[in-house]
């Protein structure tokens, strides 16, 4: 029998009557804890859930949305993954009485992550739904808002990802740091202790000029949330999705170097 731990979170309406979190420097947060909220700041290390890289997020029927807002007017948002795993062992069954052909999107039957362009009042899908085990290419918004929506469907969903959020601008940098590729990022993100590639070309973490990062920095704990360094204000935000109570179920993630699909197949066989 599969062992799991369940934690019930307070009920939230996704991005509706949500709290806006404002940050001024780099921090960590968990998507599962920010459902229905709008986060604003310089940079963010975003995990799927608090136990990322140790346990899967396996809550079925999850519909969790988050808006990320750039730090300043004229900025955009860039998101790149460090690690990505989103799928379901068994896809959701097809709807009854449907005569239309199966969708070409391979994520359609199961769990997926979808990005959106803003504004929140009129979200537009940005790219195709993402699923599988391969790290997707980075995405960037054309305006100050980038939305994320995690949907789990089917039998035994498996979710675990870590991504880097960066507020950036193009053109004159002003007080921002100019990357070698021409992007401008907040100076607070240069030589950050997580080693995040906020520029996208590594120049904000280089030991050479203009970053001049001096040796490795102590890596802070990644178990914190945004609560300690943010101010909250209530803002009405339209929903990317809707859900009732959100449950987090945890199962141990596969060890490094092992194929999680093989591990799940073995686990599934042992329970039947």
Curated annotation (Swiss-Prot):
The chain crosses the membrane at residues 234-250. Keywords: Disulfide bond, Glycoprotein, Lipoprotein, Membrane, Receptor, Signal, Transmembrane, Transmembrane helix. Residues 251-272 are cytoplasmic. Residues 202-272 are annotated as: Disordered. It comes from the Eukaryota. GO terms for cellular component: membrane. Residues 172-214 form the LDL-receptor class A domain. Residues 220-236 have a biased composition (Polar residues). InterPro entries: LDL_receptor-like_sf, LDrepeatLR_classA_rpt, LRAD2/Mig-13-like, Sperma_CUB_dom_sf. Residues 1-25 form the signal peptide. It is found in: Membrane. It is a single-pass type I membrane protein. Residues 26-233 are extracellular. SUPFAM superfamilies: LDL receptor-like module, Spermadhesin, CUB domain. Its main location: membrane. Disulfide bonds join 173-184, 179-199, 191-213. Glycans are attached at residue 97. Belongs to the LDLR family. This is Low-density lipoprotein receptor class A domain-containing protein 2. It comes from Homo sapiens. The lineage of its organism: Eukaryota, Metazoa, Chordata, Craniata, Vertebrata.
